[in-house]
Amino acid sequence: MADDGMLMNFEIGEVPIVTKQSFKGGRWKDRLAAKKTAQHRVSRSTSKPSTREIFSERQHDTGAEEYIGREPSLRAPKRQRVDDNYDSYGGRNESTAAYASGKLPSGSINLGRGRKTTFQEETRPAFVAGKLPPGSINISGKKATPIQEETRPAFVSGKLPPGSINSGARKAISFQEEKKPAYISGKLPHGSIDGMRNREMAAVHREIAEGGRKPGQVVSSLFTFNPTSKKKFDEPEEESEPAKPSNAPLTEEMATFTNLGLSRRLAAHLSTKLDMKAPTAIQKASVTQLISDDSDAFIQAETGSGKTLAYLLPIVERILALSDNGIQIHRDSGLFAIILSPTRELCKQIAAVLEKVLRCAPWIVGTTVNGGESKQSEKARLRKGVNILVATPGRLADHLDNTEVLNVATVRWLVLDEGDRLMELGFEEEIKGIVEKIGRRSVASGSSEMMSLPKRRVTILCSATMKMNVQRLGEISLKDAVHIQADPSEQEKQDKANGIEADDKAFSAPTQLKQSYAIVPAKLRLVTLTALLKRAFARKGSVMKAIVFMSCADSVDFHFSLFSRSAEKSAEASEEGKVDPPTLPKSELIKETITHGATISNNSNPVILHKLHGSLAQNIRTATLKAYSESADPCVLICTDVASRGLDLPNVDFVIEYDPPFSAEDHLHRVGRTARAGREGRALIFLMPGTEEEYVSILASGYREGRKALTHHTAEDLIQKGFGGTGREWEERATNFQLEVERWSLDSPRYLEMARRGFQSHIRAYATHVANERHIFNMQELHLGHLAKAFALRDKPGSIKVPGLRPAKMTKADRSVAARKAKRGEKEEEKAPEGERVRKQRKMELDLPTVDSNEVAARMKRKMKEHMSAASEFNIG
């Protein structure tokens, strides 16, 4: 080529000009890692003969041509032109070679001296092969290409399981050996671990291929990149003989109600009408003390041992004694006893027990006053007269201040049930005021007619977890109190004889309770809970009733909707057949809180699902609890801690603590819903690998045998038993269930909103554990991405934002409108409930002036046209 004689003030070197690699997309850490990996491959590829000899020789052998110009120096030799297709890895691709020579076959390059070098297929870099799938690393705006199967890195092939390092357009990156993994080759036998991974990944990739993943979402694998347990737990020893129940009624030979000092009328009523043949140990100790003595008392006993009757029977017996003395007692004879309970549910339950006891003496009247009910109707009942009053502290304090008909001058008993819970809920000031007002208004009993009643007000404090060193509540209410507890067991007597003192800090659980714990990674929580419930209700009659405790109301709502999905939409419906729904109670109140649990039911054993939390209206909570207690079909109650205190729910066989309790005392009350009155029961708590495993030692402190009384489970064991199948088919079934739930959540804005609210509320609740347990439940240890998968979410945790607060409670008017729509056959909108902030914003926007958007757009268009038009005589200033 002849020299054109152009003078240049710069010199171009001999090194070929190559395109600069530009890594785009993904996080900067992923781009940096990919860049370093590419550079490493360059250094390896240039060391091979097939690529090294491309640059080992001069690209041009032409000599220095004669230079005509001002400078005496020779012009630099010409370099061969290299277009954008020239690769920095030491060669061109097929299209470049063909462009240069026009005659060479695909894969060869003309080096300028007649030599022809062909790339080896095994060593060609990925960016030369031109076969990478869309979404891999983008270089210089060109489409990237994959390497051959045998040698291409895992991060290029794009077949690593989701959950590894994410790069570019969310293709997984993992720096592995350049050999194709076994689970990609697909040649492993069925049932092996890698074969299972292949099937699981096939399900995930099939979900992506079918359009199940939307932009900004992540479909991750269930069984990869899960943290493992850091501690090794010993297997419990098999019991040689079953444990003796610690809260069972005594035998008739040991004690009867008549031997405790109760009248024949009351003792016969208990044995015939209430089917109570003998008292429990705590009832034996408290009834004799409270009948014969007028001292304050502190009753301490484990949960489910009958504390309610322990204080009700002495009160009723001493009031009945007035009638035996010839005094006619009726409802306006005066208020003799006030019983305070921390929650409305416990208040209703105490009133129900009292009503059964008073059937033998219908002239003694008891009633309740608590929040959530009409004050006018309560005032009407108080005006007629009442002898025993069961109340919550807040409502009783309100009536003492504002209701003149409430006369407390004749009060002789003040009972504080669940005293520790009263203090935890912040009722200290109310209790102080109640005690002071009753003390000022009470009159000493000096009449000979009232000899059977205490001469002074007796205060009784009851709790399962109350410690002897609790002083605040004792200073408020108790004076020279007597400590009443059940007779110590033989083991405790032996320990005391040997000089071993009991640990005051340890809480007490019934000995017949079978407690276990499961170490479950965050990603597997949902499928493990599902498998556990499926296994529990697999056979009819194996489990009648179960309770699942969760930390917040939003989580309860989400899981209630999830487990009550229609059976036709279930992936297993085609295999197991259609499940016949059980008969549900017909009531408008409980229409939203009771449904058929299609997800955990089967043909032979349909399950009824209930939900309960504090955000429900009081009448709905009461009706739901009543339906759950009276149901003869298998039931599951999903609830918060509102159902953990004092409620006597019959035939509860299994308690699942899906979210750990906020304190050890809360754990005791939760598991106390089962194994009551000498019956057997099971309890299982979910813990995550890591710091939460330290909670096992706290659980063990509630048992005399320590960790020997606890059973350890893994998530894999529970999932395998729940989903079944041959080999490792259970993992594929669990993966399909998880993907199905995620699709169900994404298909409905309502359910997606519920999942997001449940996720956020769960994280907020996780941060509220008591101070001395926060090192165990550490917020910094939570993997939010894995936890989001347990709520069927595919969003990144940082993008999960729910505006506003929880939806407002449904009023009577709202329920009436919903009932009318249901009668007309109108379906509810698939719309997420609005938060408080959204409603306020909408209210504010009502005051803004209305603006026509079309007019604004037209005005803006005219303004832009005016500024962009050419100069004319009309717009030149």
Swiss-Prot record:
Reaction catalysis annotation:
ATP + H2O = ADP + phosphate + H(+)
Q: Which UniProt keywords apply?
A: ATP-binding, Helicase, Hydrolase, Nucleotide-binding, Nucleus, Ribosome biogenesis, RNA-binding, rRNA processing
Q: Which Pfam families match?
A: CTE_SPB4, DEAD, Helicase_C
Q: Which GO terms describe its biological process?
A: endonucleolytic cleavage in ITS1 upstream of 5.8S rRNA from tricistronic rRNA transcript (SSU-rRNA, 5.8S rRNA, LSU-rRNA); ribosome biogenesis
Species this chain originates from:
Sclerotinia sclerotiorum (strain ATCC 18683 / 1980 / Ss-1)
List the protein's name: ATP-dependent RNA helicase dbp7
The EC designation for this entry is: 3.6.4.13
Position of sequence motif Q motif: 255-284
Q: What is known of its domains?
A: The Q motif is unique to and characteristic of the DEAD box family of RNA helicases and controls ATP binding and hydrolysis.
Q: Which gene encodes it?
A: dbp7
